[in-house]
Amino acid sequence: MEAQLHAHLLHVVGGDFERARAQLQRWRRALARHIDIENHRLLPHLPEGARWPARLYLLEHERIALLADEYAERLDALLARLPRSQRARREAVLALLDAAHALRHLIEHHHQREEMALAHELPLAVQQAAWETGHGA
């Protein structure tokens, strides 16, 4: 998924907002599948006394999905009214990159939490089964 978001951002930097939207939509679908797998196939197996409760991961998933949707809305609004001047296009690119930064920061923080705790607290067999029947990590 990281590569998909990276590809999206490359389209943003290049000012190709149509391709950026298409790539963002693919990434958002992958994100939804990833969150669904974690919420329904991994978190129910989190042991009592885990470093962080399942509720925390669920709340982070909700926040990530919300930020992703808000970001997509910004891109859609831009596409509905494309900037005409070069300066306006550069300003639009910068605004999207700024918005993406907050989303990427939250995702990175969440991923670190998963690597520090969740990956060590769940049985390997549970993790493998979840991702084999899903889309992969």
Put a short name on every predicted segment.
Residues 1-137:
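Small-residue-biased structural context
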